[in-house]
Amino acid sequence: ALCGCVVASIGSSCGITYLMGGDYVNVCHSVKNMIANLTGMICDGAKPSCSLKISSGVSTAILSATLSMEGKHVTAAEGIIDEDVDKSIRNLTSIGKEAMCNTDDMVLNIMTHKCN
């Protein structure tokens, strides 16, 4: 599965952008920056490593908000990002819902077959 902490940090980036004086367009750009940057980070069920992923999410939220406020954002020419922010979000959820099933199985297999 996609790391829930990282996905939740997209909302943090929106709030940070708003607090920096951003408007709707800035918030949309921040969301696109987040999706482009952190999509694919998996949940491995290892709670101590969650703090590392939270740190990645928070620092990327700040970076994405700052870039957005400077007028910089990932465009539809790159990766899974679409011109429409809602479509970009749907692309992210499709990856989480459909593409991560095999990843979940592999992570579980690795965790249950360790020799520690």
Range-by-range predicted roles:
Residues 1-9:
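Aromatic-lined, polymer-binding surfaces characteristic
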Residues 9, 21-116:
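Functionally critical mobile loop/hinge segments
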